[in-house]
Amino acid sequence: VRPEQRVNVAGVQTPSLYLGDEALNNNFDDVDEFKQMSGGVATVFVRSGEDFIRISTSLTKQDGNRAIGTVLDRQGPAYQRLLAGQSYIGRAVLFERSYMTQYSPVRDASGKVIAVLFIGFDYTDAQNAQFANLKRFRIGQTGSLALLDEQKHWLVPPAGVQALEQAVPVILELAQKPGQG
């Protein structure tokens, strides 16, 4: 990292990050090759203060443009682990898409985290297809499966329920019909 040597990445001034003599800011060769070879996405983040900024990525935003110049979400599952110098492997929602991810910290000679390497595989479409199948699944005439995520949003709502607060009356009604729910 060369913090004194700033590079403009999508309108954001970032510290320059090098691999040997090669600047990684705005260099998309390796991340695009990873995408072509694996079908996944890759990102190089550089640390700037307490933020990690995407300086090279094959990840795209909703508008189809590269997500360069954007920062790692401080509220996301990886952020605190990376600050502590630990990797994160798990789910992340990025630009409204679900990914299975790995974030790995990069340290300088003193052990300070100066950058992050990321790879991710988008499973949004496969997950949506599976949820659609589960929504159609019935147990008996009126029974159904239900899946609630950690933010209490329905991934697969019970039959007849769209909002969490609707679930209790529907479940109570079904419970009053033994053998029919």
What do these predicted ranges mean?
Residues R107, L148-D149:
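Hydrophobic alpha-helical segments, especially N-terminal targeting/anchoring helices
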Residues R2-A84, A92-L94, Q151-L174:
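Extracellular/periplasmic ligand-sensing ectodomains of membrane signal-transduction proteins
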Residues F45, I119-G120, L148:
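Generic beta-strand/beta-sheet core signal
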Residues T43, G90, S144-A146:
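Conserved beta-strand cores of small sensory beta-sandwich domains that regulate signal transduction
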Residues Q86-V93, T101, G179-G181:
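PAS and PAS-like sensory modules
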Residues A132-Q141:
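Sensory modules in modular signal-transduction proteins
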Residues S16-A23, R97-F131:
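Conserved beta-strands of PAS-like sensory domains
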